[in-house]
Regions:
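Hydrophobic alpha-helical
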Residues: 106-123, 197, 211-280
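Flexible loop/hinge segments that line or gate small-molecule binding clefts
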Residues: 116-153, 177, 275-281
Length: 325
């Protein structure tokens, strides 16, 4: 496991931009999934509080969790789909506590607002492992570990790519008008990707970020906001969309506005997640670059739990390697 997860983000080698395709497994997700209770008392009971099923990436993420925590692997899984509501996740965690599960796995919708319920889990002696997104708490002993992507680094890499792209186009001195479709407000993916890109953008004297708007990580909202931005601004050069689902909607809006996107298009498109459909659009030239965020995280959390079961010391944070297309 240790060879797959980086313990220190600063030790990562320079990112190589290569074509990759994510294999997205999945089927329609119910709001709650629970393994049939087994008579075997030796099964490890894991309660999972998932964000929702708002995107193709999230569906693949859920599938990776369900694949890892099977009865065949020694687990009983209690799964809760919060439908993008933090209150639902808090309710689910309290339900897991009352059921006396062995471990709680949380992919938090927002960073803040977790101190009380995580303290309740700690008082009950139930370790909490964070997956994908992070929390902001006063006491970091309220969770055992976290595994996911470095969202700040993802945002930075998007900015560095754009800087290099403009130089290769001979346009490094041109004014560049940028709009940003942000994800769910308060989510660590949104916060990190925004911060990382802005760090690069602020030192570019000719980059103008016209607006940064909330696209909620959904295709419908991405299209709605992009259409509004196109009505408001006639000279958009670049759209930075913080996930592929919003990008799909933005591309629809761009086409309906009579403009073109991607390689040799009117608008340069930077996307995140690199789901299969996003990769295909890169190959077709409609998306210029897609920054990968690996959804296959369930197996890493399962390994953390196995290490804890074996009494091994675990790290506080595990970063997945970055690969872009």
């Amino acid at each position: 496991m240790r060879q797959f997860i980086r313990k220190n983000i600063w030790a990562v080698a320079p990112v190589v931009f290569v074509l990759v395709a994510l294999v997205l497994l999945g089927s329609p997700l119910s709001s709650k999934v629970q393994e049939t209770p087994a008579e075997d008392d030796n099964l490890i009971v894991v309660g999972v509080a998932q964000v929702g099923s708002e995107s193709v990436w999230r569906s693949a993420h859920t599938q990776s969790i369900q694949d890892a925590f099977t009865r065949a692997n020694g687990y009983m899984l209690i799964f809760d789909n919060a439908r993008q509501k933090q209150a639902n996740q808090i309710k689910a965690i309290r339900s897991f506590i009352s059921q006396q599960v062995d471990y709680i796995v949380l992919s938090p919708i927002e960073e803040s607002g977790w101190d009380t319920v995580l303290q309740e889990a700690k008082d009950a002696g139930i370790p909490v492992i964070l997956i994908d997104r992070k929390v902001s708490v006063d006491d970091d002993s309220l969770y055992a570990s976290w595994v996911g992507s470095d969202f700040v680094r993802e945002g930075q890499d998007a900015g560095y790519w754009l800087e290099d792209y403009m130089k290769k186009q001979g346009r490094e001195d041109d004014e560049v008008n940028i709009v940003v479709l942000k994800g769910t407000k308060g989510a660590s993916a949104t916060i990190g990707r925004t911060r990382g890109f802005n760090e690069v953008a602020k030192v570019q004297r000719n980059w103008n970020i016209l607006q940064q708007v909330d696209g909620e990580f959904t295709t419908a909202k991405g299209k709605e906001e992009m259409a509004r931005l196109l009505d408001q601004y006639e000279d958009i050069d670049v759209v930075v969309s913080q996930n592929d689902d919003m990008t799909f909607g933005a591309l629809e809006a761009i086409r309906e506005a009579g403009k073109t996107a991607g390689v040799n298009g009117d608008i340069t498109v930077i996307s995140f997640d690199a789901v299969d459909a996003g990769v295909e659009l890169v190959r077709n030239g409609e998306i210029n670059i897609d920054v990968q965020c690996n959804p296959d995280q369930g197996k890493y959390v399962e390994q953390i739990i196995q290490d804890m079961e074996d009494g091994k010391e675990i790290e506080k944070a595990y970063y997945l390697s970055l690969i872009h297309i």
